Amino acid sequence: MIARSAEDHFIGECDRERMEEYLEAIWILLEQGRPLVRVSWIAKRLSLSMPSVVEMLKSLDARGYVTYTIGEGILLTPKGKTIARRIVRNHRLMELLMERSIGVPMDEKSTCGFEHHMSEGMAQAICKKLGHPTECLHGQKIPTGKDCCSRSDKIQRNQKTRWG
């Protein structure tokens, strides 16, 4: 979750979720092997105008979540990576839970709503319930949790990936 500092105290829930959506989009674009992310790629991924994206990137940069250099690109800072990693993990775990445990086909809007409000404990419980999966339904890596996926869990994950 984005930290609640004195200046962030007045950020509403929708604004926090919107900021997290940008961080998630940047993570996913970087995950595709790109060294930097371009404003146009974020605009396309989130179906937003370039000026809207630039405005949010300036805000994320000012808060220390990204490094945004006009004309060059965007990178996540360690602070931004922590949040993006959590959101991506939550999203991918929720997709798997919906598909495997509930039998409900993946619904992007529902999954997106859950990812912002899922506690670390809930994410760990879902991860454990699913057998510590390494990949989501799309074959993308699921980031490991902060206190989840211990060494023995990782061995279990690797065995399930290889043999089951």
Where are these regions (language model features)?
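Basic, amphipathic "hinge/linker" alpha-helix immediately C-terminal to the N-terminal HTH DNA-binding motif
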Residues: 72-90
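N-terminal helix-turn-helix DNA-binding core of bacterial DNA-binding proteins
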Residues: 11-48
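Short, Lys/Arg-enriched N-terminal segment that forms or immediately precedes the first helix
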Residues: 1-14
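Short, hydrophobic-biased segments on the C-terminal half of alpha helices
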Residues: 57-58
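Key DNA-contact positions within bacterial/archaeal DNA-binding proteins
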Residues: 51
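C-terminal regulatory/oligomerization modules of transcriptional regulators
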Residues: 113-164
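A short, conserved structural fragment
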Residues: 61-71
